[in-house]
Structure formats: C-alpha cells, structure tokens
Curated annotation (Swiss-Prot):
Any one of the GO CC terms: host cell cytoplasm
UniProt main location, coarse: virion
Protein name listed in UniProt: Uncharacterized 38.0 kDa protein in P143-LEF5 intergenic region
Protein function: Plays a role in nucleocapsid assembly and is essential for viral replication. Distributed over the cylindrical capsid sheath of nucleocapsid.
Subunit structure: Interacts with VP1054, VP39 and VP80.
Lineage: Viruses, Viruses incertae sedis, Naldaviricetes, Lefavirales, Baculoviridae
Location within or outside the cell: Virion; Host nucleus; Host cytoplasm
Keyword list, A-Z: Host cytoplasm, Host nucleus, Virion
CDD domains cross-referenced by the UniProt entry: HAD_like
Pfam families per record: DUF705
C-alpha cells in the first residue's frame, strides 16, 4: 500500500541521449559524476529526490544538456513515480530503471522492481519477441483462467478470444502461477492454453526423482521435452517479504521485468496484473481483480473489456 506522504522529485530529460527511454535513479544530482566521461548520454531520464535547495535548481538550469521537471509523488509508489515521469515529459514508454552499481539509492519505490546496473545498458540487445512498445499483461492461472476442480476446465470459452485479441494488439502475455511446474503444464495442456503466452512462470518445485525428460539450465528454466514447454522457476529474493504481516508474497513486477529483459523486451508502456487475489498486486500500473471460479462461469467478457479499456485510456492520455 502506497504512503499518502508526498515527496518532491526532480526529473531531468537529456536533450541528446544516445539511448532513449531508460531512467537513471540517483541519490542526488552530484552522483552524475560517477558515470564517467560521456556515459551520461546512455540515460534519457535522471530522477532523484529534491532536497529543497534553491541553489541546486539554479545549477541544473545552467546545465543546458537537460530540461527539468519537478513533481510530487509518494516515495514508496513506483506506479506513481513512473506515471509522473511519463506525464511530465509526455512519453508513453519507459525502459529500465537503472542504478549506479557503486552508489545505489535507497528509495522505497525501488523495492520489487527489476533494477539494471548502469553499466549494463550498453549491452542490451535490440532484437525482441515483439515489434514496437507493448503493453504487458500478467495472468494468474488457478481460479482466474481455469477452475478449481480436480479436472480443471477453462473459466469461460471467451478466454480464448480474449487472449487472441490481446495478442493481436501486440500485448506481451505472461502467465504466472504459484502452482507447481507439473500442475501448470498439465492444466494448460488440458484446457488448450499452451500457445497464448510469451512467458510462463511457475513457483519452483523439487523434482522427487530423476527424470530423463527434464533438463534444467543455468537460467532457472526447466525444459520438459514430453510436454515441449519451457518453464521458468521463480527463485528470486523478494524485497518486501519481511515487511508484510501475512504470508502472502505478491507477484512482484521485478520477476516479470527480468524475464521480459531476457527476451529483449526492454521497453514497455504499461504492465497489468489479472488475478483473483488482491494480495498479489504490487506496483502494477493496472490491476484487474477477478472473482474466483470454483466451476465454469461465463463472465470473462467483463474482465476483458476492463483490460482493453485501461489500455485504450492509456493510449488516449498520451494523444492529448
């Protein structure tokens, strides 16, 4: 839950950035010196907390490489920070949040967000699984897309049309289930959902006996040659787990963004979570809460329309 306390932020936009859309997050303006010669041109945006020093504004205004915007936003809300950067500079797309490896800032909004060390920006590849700048939609599986029955069924046949339309719109579709790899694989096969998702994430599970059809690689992925699927095991360390009073770990955008980056999706417009559990939502741009479905129910068109409307409203906002 975001704090109601507002902090002032200075966001700078570099006029002649070599690499566009990435955001460098600093503890203070003076930290720019740690980038070294000409490295500042790799970051179009720079953001840091405003310390109410009027002299600082004058110094920045005299640096003609940058234009400056000041805005207020909660210090623990990445969603608000991203929105304000986009709003201030009228850009619908951002790249990675980057930090100095030798002097990382300690802002709360950086929790549960994938942070790219500043020196890795130049090594990012341009080839991607998608053209243009996509919206990312993350779906839960159990009681969201499928039922809770022992023999699972699709929640609503309209789910297929919904996923197909989102795919045709250029969205990157991610499935993230806290179920075991076997459960996810077999459930998707049983309801014919295998071909719709660009990334499939499941909670890590221990294989009880050695199986010749499973091969695990160095990227925490298991390739199941019987099912012809590649599953990513969630082995990330969560930043906020120790700060929560319950045992529900949210579906951190950190993990999604990391695997998007692995597929060279380094820029996106918005990220949406579609899930029946509100506790899974943390720092997503949009959250679509669905009702549980122990058995099939024909209600998916309502949720589909909400997803689409959010995307359309987002696009319209930046056309104004």
């Amino acid at each position: 839950m975001a704090s109601s306390l507002q902090s002032k932020w200075i966001c700078l936009r570099l006029n002649d950035a070599i690499i566009k859309r990435h955001v460098l997050v600093l503890s203070e303006y003076a930290d720019l010196k740690y980038l070294g010669f000409e490295k500042y041109k790799f970051f179009e945006y720079v953001i840091f907390q405003f310390c109410n020093d009027p002299q600082l504004c004058k110094i920045i205004e005299n640096n003609y490489n940058y234009c400056m915007q000041i805005f207020k936003a909660p210090a623990d809300d990445m969603r608000d920070i991203r929105h304000n950067i986009k709003r201030a500079f009228k850009t619908p797309v951002l790249g990675h949040m980057c930090v100095l490896s030798n002097k990382p800032p300690m802002y709360s909004f950086l929790k549960e967000w994938f942070l790219l060390p500043h020196y890795k920006v130049v090594s990012l590849k341009s080839e991607s699984l998608t053209w243009g700048f996509p919206h990312v939609v993350v779906f839960d599986l159990d009681s969201t897309l499928i039922t809770e029955e022992e023999q699972v069924e699709i929640r609503d046949p309209f789910v297929y049309d919904s996923l197909q339309e989102l795919h045709e719109m250029g969205c990157v579709l991610v499935l993230w289930s806290y179920g075991s790899r076997d459960h996810v694989a077999h459930s998707m096969r049983d309801v014919d959902l295998e071909g719709y998702f660009d990334i499939i994430i499941s909670e890590g599970s221990t294989v009880q006996e050695e199986r010749s059809d499973l091969v695990q690689n160095s990227h925490n992925a298991i390739v199941d040659y019987n099912l012809k699927k590649r599953f990513i095991e969630n082995k990330f360390v969560f930043d906020i787990h120790n700060h929560r009073s319950d045992n529900n770990i949210p579906k951190s955008p950190k993990i999604v963004i990391k695997y998007l980056s692995d597929k060279n999706v380094n820029f996106f417009k918005s990220i949406t979570l579609v899930d029946d559990l509100p506790t899974n939502n943390y720092a997503y741009d949009f959250y679509v809460k669905v009702k549980r479905c122990p058995t099939p129910v024909q209600d998916w068109e309502h949720y589909h329309n909400e997803i689409i409307q959010n995307i359309m409203d987002y696009e319209q906002y930046f056309i104004k």
